[in-house]
């Protein structure tokens, strides 16, 4: 069985470690970030964020040609949305801002084809995955032919690589 190609949107504290681990496991991974400096840095085999052990994983993934970074999404079989979910400014009760999640979904929607999987991996509220599916459907994606899933983000800064390697993860 052919290994799937993976496109990870968002190369920050979740996306880049995930991309490097998948690439070092033998998957062809394209990483996407709107920050051109981050993309250039990653493609040199360097990192633009501070996280213990991440530099070695990224360097190995880039040297093996299994990880490449771009500023726009590339065709894949699996799309992982790993962008921030900040809170809206103001208000008495903090409300999550899904603008980055929905923009990332819109960016991959034209590439999603039958049999593909789209995974939201972000600290986001109940109903976020449904909103991702709605954006895909609005873009013309037939939801009966693709898989849409959620994977909670559960790592501690400074221990991300260890936790990604050792913690069990659920995708559903």
Stretches found by the model and what they are:
Residues 87-154:
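Rossmann-like NAD(P)(H) cofactor-binding subdomain of soluble oxidoreductases
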Residues 79-81, 120, 172:
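Redox-cofactor binding/interface segments in oxidoreductases and associated redox assembly factors
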Residues 123-125, 135, 161-172:
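Short beta-strand and adjoining strand-loop segment in the mid-core
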Residues 19, 23-24:
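Gly/Ala-rich phosphate-binding loop of Rossmann-like dinucleotide-binding domains
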Residues 11-12:
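Glycine-rich Rossmann-fold phosphate-binding loop(s) that bind the pyrophosphate
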Residues 2-3, 28, 34-78, 82-95, ...:
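Conserved N-terminal Rossmann-fold NAD(P) cofactor-binding segment
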Residues 15-16:
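N-terminal Rossmann-fold NAD(P) dinucleotide-binding loop
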């Amino acid at each position: 069985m052919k290994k799937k190609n993976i496109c990870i949107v968002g190369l920050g504290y979740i996306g880049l470690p995930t991309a490097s681990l998948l690439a070092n496991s033998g998957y062809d991974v394209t990483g996407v970030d709107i920050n051109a400096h981050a993309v250039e840095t990653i493609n040199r085999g360097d990192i633009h964020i501070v996280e213990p052990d991440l530099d070695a994983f990224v360097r190995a993934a880039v040297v093996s040609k299994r990880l490449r970074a771009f500023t726009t999404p590339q065709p894949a079989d699996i799309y992982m949305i790993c962008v921030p979910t900040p809170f809206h400014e103001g208000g008495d009760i903090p409300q999550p801002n899904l603008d980055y999640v929905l923009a990332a979904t819109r960016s991959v929607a034209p590439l999603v084809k039958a049999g593909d999987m789209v995974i939201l991996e972000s600290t986001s509220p109940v109903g976020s995955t449904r909103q991702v599916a709605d954006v895909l459907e609005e873009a013309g994606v037939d939801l009966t032919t693709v898989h849409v899933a959620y994977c909670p983000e559960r790592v501690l800064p400074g221990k991300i690589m260890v936790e990604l390697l050792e913690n069990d993860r659920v995708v559903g």
